[in-house]
């Protein structure tokens, strides 16, 4: 209700990234921003078939809004594209029929991976990661001075039994 009240009070747009809605690990129910009463014209929901079904690079998703002005602006941008991802569209269409059991198995696997990752990270001296409540990634605090350089070092120089780790600096995802 707090978000809805702020959106209403200041007449803001609420961009709601709901691509990981199947991956909420707290037991809390998923509540879409589209169900917030009184701000229907302010909500812009972002969804992605490619993320839901682990189809990295397919880039097929949706932007959903009841706001006609926003919809028209988005359509102008979309119509300027010269080549929609036809193969990606075909893959995404087939993915929609994925059995519910598969999604449950994927959910269980992500919970297991999350628990393993967080447990391992938090055992390293100087490293801390909160337990993510959703999705399948974490933002960990590491004892390094420069996250960009550390991530590059992991890819170019780190080796453990012939393997490495790919990380991304959180600065690329957040402004705070």
Stretches found by the model and what they are:
Residues 1-176:
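PLP-dependent class I/II
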